[in-house]
From Swiss-Prot:
The active site is at 70 (proton acceptor). Excises uracil residues from the DNA which can arise as a result of misincorporation of dUMP residues by DNA polymerase or due to deamination of cytosine. It is an enzyme of class 3 (hydrolase). Its EC number is 3.2.2.27. SMART domains: UDG (SM00986), UreE_C (SM00987). It comes from Pseudomonas putida (strain ATCC 47054 / DSM 6125 / CFBP 8728 / NCIMB 11950 / KT2440). Keywords: Cytoplasm, DNA damage, DNA repair, Hydrolase. Coiled coil: none annotated. GO terms for cellular component: cytoplasm. This is Uracil-DNA glycosylase. Signal peptide: none annotated.
Length: 230
């Protein structure tokens, strides 16, 4: 049995990424994570949720991709979807700004929570390019191998899915544009929604309405960006 046979991954992703789990970088990443757990470090998100973005949004259902950097590093926040937090956790500042733009762009009331699972289940792949982090230690798992894996995920979406909208917010996300076939897909770029930059172009970008217009023009259902109450 190879390592990828033991990974709990949604079938379409497991088929598309078969072989990645036997690459040298993945063996190194696995050993790094084993060492972190063995040292008693608290790693987020919890193990069963590390691949939540993939398990919530099958490859053949991807309509929109939003890229984040690494998971939230506070207790109880991260659950494997970028920008999203678990129910009962305060909405982080960047997500508040995303909500402000949704309100401006589509007149959607600002939700009382930060749980984006309904977006994922509609085809929004909420992908952090680094998929784990140590508690209270931002970017602690950067450059350990995750970026190679998530680059491959972006490439697979670009190659195998038609008519996807990629929302690239900030320099880190925009560095991934080279992995995307811009002749097949819509790539929308803006500054990051963080409080440091949101009012330098994110607020006013219109990405959510533009994404839905693109999808509807191609006979695909729009995303309902309004979140259900918890």
């Amino acid at each position: 049995m190879t390592d990828d046979d033991r990974i709990k991954l949604e079938p379409s992703w497991k088929a598309a990424l078969r072989g990645e789990f036997d690459q040298p970088y993945m063996h190194q990443l696995r050993e790094f994570l084993r060492g972190e757990y063995a040292a008693g470090k608290e790693i987020y998100p919890p193990g069963p949720l590390i691949f939540n973005a993939l398990n919530s949004t099958p490859l053949d259902q991807v309509k929109v991709v939003i890229l984040g950097q690494d998971p939230y590093h506070g207790p109880g926040q991260a659950h494997g979807l970028c920008f999203s937090v678990q129910p009962g956790v305060a909405t982080p500042p960047s997500l508040v700004n995303i909500y402000k733009e949704l309100q401006r762009d589509l007149n959607i009331p600002i939700p009382s929570h930060g749980y984006l699972q309904s977006w994922a289940e509609q085809g929004v792949l909420l992908l952090n390019t680094t998929m784990t982090v140590e508690r209270a230690n931002a970017a602690s798992h950067a450059k350990k191998g995750w970026e190679l894996f998530t680059d491959r995920i972006i490439q697979v979406v670009s190659e195998q899915c038609p008519n996807v909208v990629f929302l690239l917010w900030g320099a880190h996300a925009q560095s991934k544009q080279k992995l995307i076939d811009g002749t097949k897909h819509l790539v929308l770029k803006s500054v990051h929604p963080s409080p440091l930059s949101a009012y330098r172009g994110f607020i006013g970008c219109g990405h959510f309405s533009r994404a839905n217009s693109f999808l509807e023009q191609r006979g695909l259902g729009p995303i309902d960006w309004a979140l259900p109450p918890l």
